[in-house]
Amino acid sequence: MKLYGGFGSPFTRRVGVTLQLYKLEHEHIVLRGSVPEELERLQKFNPLGRVPALETDDGRALADSATILDYLDQLAGPEKSLTPASGDARTEVMNIIGISAGAVEKSISCYLSLIHI
């Protein structure tokens, strides 16, 4: 597998941490959508040009950290998965993840507006 994105992105970082926790062999390739020279290559894996993106061993491209984490949970199997497989426990975990991801996105947006990007 290949993980595309810089660890300056909290979303790339959460995928990288999960890959390490699951002990899944992967290559990390630093690509940033904010760098014009890297954007075109990144768009091959995520048409939106956002990180992270994951290229699976069979060549599929996955975009968005939530989608990638769901894929990694499936690879890890039910015994190792960080997310419950079903039921109320899964719903509660997914809700917490959604709120957390939204808070991070809002923080990044506020930061970027302060530095006028």
PLM features per residue range, with description:
Residues 1-115:
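GST-like domain detector, emphasizing the conserved glutathione-binding G-site
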